[in-house]
Amino acid sequence: MRACLFISLFLFAFSFPSLAWQHQRATVDTIPGKNDLVPFTIRLPKYPLPGRDSAKNAAPRKNLLAFPFAVRSLETNWGLGGIAARFFKPGKQDSTIRTSDVNVLGLYTLRNQLILVLSSTIYFPKEDHILRFQASYSYYPDDFWGLGDHTEFTQKTGFSQKQYFINPQFLKRVHHNMYIGLTYEYQHTGPVTYPADGVFDKEDITGRHGGNTSGIGPILSWDTRNNAYSPDHGGFAEIQYEYFRSFTGSDFKFTLLSIDLRKFFYLSPKSVFAIQGLGGLTFGNTPFRKLEELGGTDMMRGYYGGRYTDKCLMAYQAEYRRFLFWRIGIVAFAATGEVASSPGRFELDGFHYTGGGGLRFALSKEEKLNLRVDYGVARHSNAFTVQLREAF
């Protein structure tokens, strides 16, 4: 285990000179989730949010970045991959806007999972408009426990499925740090390969035979964080609503509503307290790949991504972050959450709990870009993960 961790640290450290100028690529809080792309394996190169950036006015020292990386999670075991990114500014150079980018990423894991991703963010003059784009292909052996908040561990069923995904988004500034926008999402999934007479057939799971989901909807985003990667004060709030119908090209008729709220409290020059709340609702004939899921490397660390799955979700987490010395820091975190078949079916005794701690290694002290090593503990489960960027 120590040898594997050393390899991961080495790969990230090797790319440090290039990573130091990646400030224009903020974390993506609105990119496709587990069911769209890759079940909570890595923090992909993400769409910069329309908030403030700690080094917004600085021009990159280079316009091309390429480096290898290693990741680990319950869902993937260890994975190796590489990323290449091109940075540019459309038209005339403008130091008042962030740099646009195009990223290509590939990942292969010890569970024979393959993920290929193309993503891009383009900033228009004065950042009054932002265009985001993401496309991906994935072949993903995974696990499923059925629907509900009280599924037994023994219900676990292995399956595999191919997915194609595309998601353009367009945002327009309406007031200071407030943006409104439009998102379109298309996903094609092949038939699920799974054991006969398993949970997929017993529960008549929607989407197990594959199909197309195609939907459109609005985005409302507000961001006052002072740093894209690891803020020490400010807040973030985003609401997305997506409408899937036959006239949009979807084989399934359903709607999605998601809410993401975050707040960061400055305690001292070396410590920060952060909290997050997530909410999700789906209505209609929702395929299982678009349902709400509990677990993963970001929320409810310690549980497998999708350990509990249903139409509605609420989850909360808190994290204390402390810088120690040089590039080293520590964190302690706790989370709780549950899923339900409808908003009225949430129960006080239905919450699941996780907790844990981790180490941080600053790849870029200026931009607060960290390598994250976490160990989460949950009921009948625990997880050791190595990721790039904070959980939130």
Residue ranges and their predicted role:
Residues 23-53, 62-65, 130, 134-267, ...:
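Transmembrane beta-strand segments of outer-membrane beta-barrel domains in Gram-negative
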Residues 305-309, 343-349, 376:
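Short, contiguous acidic/charged loop-to-helix segments that flank catalytic cores in large enzymes
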Residues 56-66, 70-212, 307-309, 369-370, ...:
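Gram-negative/organellar outer-membrane beta-barrel architecture
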Residues 216-221, 225-326, 330-333:
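C-terminal outer-membrane beta-barrel translocator/porin domains of Gram-negative envelope proteins
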Residues 21-133, 207-230, 323-329, 339-343, ...:
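Outer-membrane beta-barrel initiation region
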Residues 217-218, 356-366, 381-392:
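Outer-membrane beta-barrel "beta-signal"
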Residues 200-204, 289-300, 338, 345-357:
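Solvent-exposed, glycine/polar-rich loop segments of beta-barrel outer-membrane systems
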Residues 1-30:
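Bacterial Sec-dependent N-terminal signal peptides
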